[in-house]
Amino acid sequence: MSNKESNVALQTLRVTKDMKDFLSHRIVGEPPANIKIEYQKIHRYRTCVCPSTGHISELCPSGDLILSLGAHRNVIAAATVYDVVKNKIKSTTSKAGTSSTLSSLGLSGFQKPKIGSKNKKTMFSKQNNSTNESDESGGEEGSSLNDLPKSDLINAIMELASQGRNNSKGKGKRGGKR
């Protein structure tokens, strides 16, 4: 087997206003400004994550893509959020030259999803509905966020993408080009 060039690339994903609104109801804390994701360079496996439904993913104005396996419009696998060099989950903040780990969102132990995994959690509700800001675990800021499931942000992005796909069904074929 020769080492061929990988079809998977890294990209920084901008969290748009619509995505931020969507994520803020599903995770504790403020969603980061940017996250790093893996995506497929092969066009037919690309899926955009922006909430707009009036375009195909290759023409997505945001250019934000998540790794998908299978048909063009079916999101099967979540994007993998991680820092390749340090093998840690990282997110760049909007402040120039700084970065912060996504552990503040409770994602510090996130593992790469296994291909073919059938574990589909539809929604990841906030586990602590009561504001448990001051835990017994040292009183660190955001320590209660570590109680969240590790893939909340990924699931939210994946669900957002699939919602966009479901909303666009039946709207695309208005005659004309084939």
From Swiss-Prot:
Residue ranges that the Swiss-Prot or TrEMBL entry lists as coiled coil: none
Region (Disordered): 113-178
Pfam families documented for this protein: Pns11_12
Gene Ontology terms for molecular function: RNA binding
UniProt keyword annotations, A-Z: Host cytoplasm, RNA-binding
Ranges annotated as biased composition (Basic residues): 168-178
Localization per Swiss-Prot or TrEMBL: Host cytoplasm
Gene Ontology CC annotations of this record: host cell cytoplasm
Record's function text: Constituent of viral factories. Binds to ssRNA and dsRNA.
Annotated family: Belongs to the phytoreovirus RNA-binding protein family.
Protein name: RNA-binding protein
Lineage: Viruses, Riboviria, Orthornavirae, Duplornaviricota, Resentoviricetes
